[in-house]
């Protein structure tokens, strides 16, 4: 489906949920994904199925800066002065680079698939040990921001999440309804306006 088609599917699902309709269950046979009592999947988006999404988390990182170079330098006073000045410049660059890398920023990860349920968002994320499922409970979401095909979720106790891709507006519509209920239109105003004008 095209990006435009995915957008209109998001508008359609937003309108359906706003009118009180219930989404049907989507079968999911994924090892590691264990739904809670009463929880069921309503959408599955896999890179291999033609619905790729990108995934990033916003946080600071621990960066270790290690001094390199010889411990003992021998030479004329001019050579030693030049060496010390050059070393100071290189160390300054290395410290600035380490600070830049350690600063809070969006840090992307590989994302294999995303499952949207009635209670949580599940993401199969690439780690150093392969792929691992992480989930985000809707009741922990304090802010949902949809800008085009990018969704930013802010949580009570964990770092923010950024998803991007053609099907992200659909995910945003569903998450907004399960998290905010009747106030969902306030969380996804673009979808709500589009739903009002298309009906």
What does each model-found stretch correspond to?
Residues 3-23, 28-42, 47, 53, ...:
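Acidic, Ser/Thr- and proline-rich intrinsically disordered linker/docking segments
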Residues 114-116:
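Mid-length scaffold segments of soluble, non-membrane domains
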Residues 118-120:
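Short, hydrophobic/aromatic-rich segments at coil-to-beta transitions
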